[in-house]
Curated annotation (Swiss-Prot):
Belongs to the eIF-2B alpha/beta/delta subunits family. MtnA subfamily. InterPro entries: IF-2B-related, IF-M1Pi, IF_2B-like_C, Initiation_fac_2B_a/b/d, M1Pi_N, NagB/RpiA_transferase-like. The active site is at 246 (proton donor). It is found in: Cytoplasm; Nucleus. One of its GO terms (cellular component) is cytoplasm. This is Methylthioribose-1-phosphate isomerase. Catalyzes the interconversion of methylthioribose-1-phosphate (MTR-1-P) into methylthioribulose-1-phosphate (MTRu-1-P). The gene is mri1. The record marks 166 as: Transition state stabilizer. Its EC number is 5.3.1.23. It comes from Xenopus tropicalis. NCBIfam families: eIF-2B_rel (TIGR00524), PRK05720.1 (NF004326), salvage_mtnA (TIGR00512). Keywords: Amino-acid biosynthesis, Cytoplasm, Isomerase, Methionine biosynthesis, Nucleus. GO terms for molecular function: S-methyl-5-thioribose-1-phosphate isomerase activity.
Length: 354
């Protein structure tokens, strides 16, 4: 059984407080939008897909008990709530896309004859619940497409060795995972020899979360520091690198956890493929290049302190961007629930048939 970042039933939402992992597994109730935004902002929940899921479900939970006088006030409340959730962590595009789609859906529902606040609330709740279900299905497709694509260049029975960064598994999504979903699918097929996961400083999502998931799933894995990646690729014969994404723009430039860019550079130097695994909800075709992506900067104490203990000299300056942007030229392929695309194929691949 996979780990769960969220536990949801109608009117009830609990999130696994990932700040406490791996030492303690504790689910905390989220009773409304404010708690949802706080959980996102403080990184109790993280990962672009999971942020969107928790955001819309926190709204759904609040709507089960909230009453509004009329339809206009209901719409205003939903719009304000979604803005608040988007602002909690702006780099990850999934929450913004979910907010835009939900606002458009709500506007159409409100135009229907006889629309009531109660009926609209039910529609929004059902929309959020459908998003939860679809995320798991999409992640399984990503895993299957990615594994199949990577194995196309391997021998009929050859096993592959992977390297991944940050946390992109069940803890970063509604379930199964994106980049870690690809690793999981390779393992299920019996074609994974090993996976290396980086610790992912300064927030240590790799050592705290990915290592936790890999041990839980009994997947053969080794934890390395971020600075060991190049040596691991060369000396441990890594087949390919696969990472997740917080935002992929139209030309394929990708914003992901800080440290991703350098992995793409070393993968290119060593002549191995570098893949981005992300659902279409993480793809923002409205931005032409990665230069337009807003990069979140985190507090300095996340770099200077560990568990409340300062490890850096007082007075030192700190630059702590949460993400970097990998140029599309360094990306071999983008693995989505609709297939695997070269960066230059992404727009057509995602818009075909729409």
């Amino acid at each position: 059984m996979s780990l769960e970042s969220v536990r949801y039933s109608r009117g009830s939402l609990q999130v696994l407080n990932q700040l406490l992992l791996p030492h303690k597994s504790e689910y905390e109730p989220v009773t409304g939008v404010q708690q949802g935004a706080d959980a996102i902002r403080t990184m109790k929940v993280r990962g672009a897909p999971a942020i969107a899921i928790v955001g819309v479900l926190s709204l759904a939970v609040e709507l089960t008990s909230r009453t509004c006088q009329d339809v206009p006030s209901f719409i205003a409340f939903v719009q304000e709530s979604l803005c608040h959730l988007v602002d909690a962590r702006p780099t990850a595009v999934n929450m913004k896309k979910a907010a835009d789609e939900l606002n458009a859906f709500l506007a159409k529902e409100a135009e229907k004859a006889g629309a009531t606040t109660q009926g609209l609330a039910e529609s929004v709740i059902q929309w959020a619940e459908a998003l939860l279900k679809k995320d798991v299905e999409d992640n399984q497709m990503i895993g299957d497409f990615g594994a199949k694509h990577i194995l196309e260049t391997a021998g009929p029975t050859e096993k592959v060795c992977m390297l991944t960064h940050c946390n992109t598994g069940s803890l970063a999504t509604a379930g199964y995972g994106t980049a870690l979903g690809v690793v999981r699918s390779l393992h299920v097929l019996g074609r994974l020899s090993h996976v290396f996961c980086t610790e992912t400083r300064p927030y240590n999502q790799g050592s705290r979360l990915t290592a936790y998931e890999l041990v839980y799933e009994k997947i053969p894995a080794t934890l390395i520091t971020d600075s060991m990646a190049s040596a691991a690729i060369r000396d441990r014969k890594v087949t390919a690198v696969v990472v997740g994404a917080d935002r992929v723009v139209a030309n394929g430039d990708t914003a992901n956890k800080i440290g991703t860019y350098q992995l793409a550079i070393t993968a290119r130097y060593h002549g191995i493929p570098f893949y981005v695994a992300a659902p279409s909800t993480s793809c923002d075709l409205s931005l032409p290049t990665g230069g337009s992506i807003v990069i979140e900067e985190r507090p300095s104490h996340e770099l200077t302190d560990i568990n409340g203990v300062r490890i850096a000299a007082p007075g030192i300056g700190v630059w702590n961007p949460a993400f970097d942007v990998t140029p599309h030229e360094l990306i071999t392929g983008i693995i989505t629930e609709r297939g695997v695309f070269k960066p230059e194929e992404l727009r057509d691949g995602l818009t075909k048939g729409q």
